[in-house]
């Protein structure tokens, strides 16, 4: 019995020593080491209940500090992204009808509808969440019933898959066809344009019951290049917002647990 008591007391002392070192690591800002030391108390000294209880409280403080520091970092990153966005957004036209649109779309100025009536081309757009898409617009006479496009330079090319969102209409007897492609499911068309942006002869071919070929104008190529840059900034900001939300949720959870522990201690 005396041996068991001695061993028990020894474990308590060792656990207390680990807890002391964990506190020191926490104060030094070495949160990973502090967590390892707290976990060691639970693993190696499961019956050192007082040390384990204090370890749980310390772990909550570690979690809280980590999330608060993470928020500070995320806030600084968001400020950097916002500054970049502020410098970029003047290059684009934001179209948004607040009556029925929650999210607006950014266009390159040369590609807005009113400047392109009667023109067949590939239009790029990026919504306010950083999601980029392409729209192939055909109105060169007659119907193609096109659902895909190909961009090419010489023997190299990229081709969209068949669009899941294509539609046709007429305007004063002229056939107008449009097909949408989300970037990421565009068959590498955007990346092909980026890789060949310095070429002057990027061919654009509309693929349907028959084909129609034209050459991408320099401003259409530039629209894709510029909007890719905007998409990266906006999507990066959306990712930061998600991480900020997660950090705030974790902070509220930890604070609630700490409050519960305080109330339990009073009882």
Regions found by a protein language model. Give the residues of each.
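Generic helix N-cap/helix-start motif at coil->alpha-helix transitions
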Residues: 13-18
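Hydrophobic/aromatic side-chain positions at a characteristic register within alpha-helices
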Residues: 19, 26-27
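Short, charge-rich amphipathic alpha-helical segments embedded
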Residues: 35-67
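Alpha-helical linker/edge segments of TPR/alpha-solenoid repeat scaffolds
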Residues: 58-89, 97-100
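Internal interaction segment
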Residues: 173-181, 199-267
């Amino acid at each position: 019995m005396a041996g068991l008591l001695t061993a028990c007391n020894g474990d308590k002392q060792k656990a207390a020593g680990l807890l002391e070192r964990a506190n020191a690591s926490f104060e030094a800002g070495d949160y990973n080491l502090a967590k390892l030391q707290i976990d060691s108390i639970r693993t190696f000294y499961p019956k050192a209940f007082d040390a384990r209880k204090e370890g749980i409280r310390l772990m909550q403080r570690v979690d809280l500090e980590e999330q608060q520091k993470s928020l500070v970092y995320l806030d600084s990153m968001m400020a950097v992204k916002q500054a970049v966005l502020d410098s970029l957004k003047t290059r684009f036209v934001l179209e948004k009808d607040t009556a029925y649109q929650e999210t607006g779309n950014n266009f390159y100025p040369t590609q807005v509808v009113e400047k392109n009536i009667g023109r067949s081309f590939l239009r790029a757009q990026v919504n306010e969440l950083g999601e980029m898409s392409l729209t192939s617009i055909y109105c060169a006479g007659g119907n193609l019933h096109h659902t895909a496009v190909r961009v090419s330079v010489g023997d190299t090319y990229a081709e969209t898959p068949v669009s899941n969102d294509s539609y046709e209409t007429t305007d004063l007897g002229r056939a107008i066809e449009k097909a949408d492609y989300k970037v990421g499911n565009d068959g590498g068309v955007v990346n092909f344009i980026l890789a060949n942006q310095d070429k002057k002869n990027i061919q654009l071919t509309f693929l349907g019951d028959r084909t129609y070929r034209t050459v991408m104008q320099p401003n259409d190529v530039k629209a894709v290049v510029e909007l890719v840059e905007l998409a990266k900034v906006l999507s990066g900001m959306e990712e930061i917002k998600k991480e900020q939300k997660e950090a705030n949720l974790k902070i509220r959870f930890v604070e609630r647990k700490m409050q519960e522990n305080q109330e339990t201690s009073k009882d």
